[in-house]
């Protein structure tokens, strides 16, 4: 059995965004432990399993927003020093990082409440501890689109994406832009081309495009209804895949159907966030919760390998 990614769930359900399609709400919060102390015994077992299964990438993510728990992120990075994972990534909506960027470039001193507890000291420390990549979740590169989805108002104070990217690059991070494709945002080949051009202009190392999806079993009818309304049809997804294949050079096929292309020097990955392929026995992601629970799927509660402390 091979495992592609070792995912670590940081924090609680708390989040500083208002995504109407929240995947965590749809997959549910029942898996989250009530206590936030890390089960070191099971973490060691999970890391050993991932290492022996050939995992090269650790992804710190959350059912909420992981950067609201910077000390917990730091703790996991210290724990990972004992394991030979070469690629360590953090998935985030980027709001707190963007606010730090705005403060930095405007030369305005803000207290930690502005960035909700996150500081430049945290980011530099994470980089020193081996965090390679910041994966920024967005619905595109238009500020009003991101503001409407993540903050609930197109006129809300969403940090300029270009400034966030520049700030993270300045620290030394690799940046991946993770675009959730949807109607009203990036939903056509033309919008995909515009997004690729933005990434090239701002030297974004990696671009991942995923269609908005809902899980087979949902815990949030409202979020699922939003996905039904704004999600792309199969014809739209096909057209985007064909367009990228036409202008790009295929580089590699990843587990569960993801395809990586070079498009005039820009790395572009076409993926699907909830794809399941049990046929080959490989695991797309090994998921560790702080209470020690270890699973291999976000949607299905039966995909459990280790139970956590009750």
Predicted regions and their residues:
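Canonical Radical SAM [4Fe-4S] cluster-binding loop centered on the CxxxCxxC motif
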Residues: 1-42, 52-54
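Radical SAM enzyme core and accessory elements
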Residues: 277-310
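Radical SAM enzyme [4Fe-4S]-AdoMet core and its adjacent flexible, acidic
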Residues: 31-34, 144-162, 166-278
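Short loop/turn segments at strand-loop or loop-helix junctions that form parts
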Residues: 11, 23-24, 136-141, 209-212
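Radical SAM/AdoMet-radical enzyme domain recognition
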Residues: 43-60, 70-184, 189
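Short, solvent-exposed loop/turn segments at secondary-structure junctions
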Residues: 15, 96, 140-141, 182, ...
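Conserved strand-to-loop "acid loop" that flanks and positions the catalytic carboxylate
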Residues: 63
């Amino acid at each position: 059995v091979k495992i592609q990614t070792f995912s670590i769930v940081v924090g609680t359900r708390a989040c500083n965004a208002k995504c109407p399609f929240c995947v965590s709400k749809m997959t549910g919060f029942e898996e989250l432990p009530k206590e936030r102390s890390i089960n070191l015994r099971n973490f060691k077992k999970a890391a050993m399993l991932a290492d022996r299964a050939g995992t090269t990438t650790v992804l710190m993510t959350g059912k909420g927003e992981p950067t609201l728990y910077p000390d917990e992120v730091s703790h996991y990075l210290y724990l990972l020093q004992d394991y030979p994972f070469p690629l360590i990534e953090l998935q985030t909506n980027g709001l707190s990082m963007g606010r730090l960027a705005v403060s930095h470039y405007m030369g305005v001193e803000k207290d930690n409440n502005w960035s909700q507890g996150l500081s430049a000291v945290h980011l530099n420390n994470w980089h020193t501890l081996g965090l390679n990549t910041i994966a920024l979740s967005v619905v595109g590169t238009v500020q009003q689109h991101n503001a409407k989805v993540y903050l609930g108002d197109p006129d809300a104070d969403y940090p300029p994406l270009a400034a966030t990217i520049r700030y993270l690059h300045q620290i030394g991070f690799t940046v991946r832009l993770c675009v959730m494709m949807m109607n009203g945002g990036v939903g056509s080949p033309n919008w995909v081309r515009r997004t690729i051009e933005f990434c090239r202009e701002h030297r974004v190392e990696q671009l991942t495009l995923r269609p908005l999806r809902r899980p087979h079993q949902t815990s949030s009818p409202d979020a699922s209804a939003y996905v039904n309304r704004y999600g792309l049809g199969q014809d739209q997804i096909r057209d985007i895949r064909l367009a990228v294949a036409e202008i790009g050079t295929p580089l590699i096929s990843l587990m569960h159907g993801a395809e990586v292309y070079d498009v005039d020097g820009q790395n572009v990955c076409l993926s699907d966030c909830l794809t399941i392929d049990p046929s080959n026995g490989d695991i797309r992601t090994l998921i560790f919760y702080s209470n020690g629970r270890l699973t291999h799927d976000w949607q299905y509660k039966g995909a459990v390998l280790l139970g956590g402390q009750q």
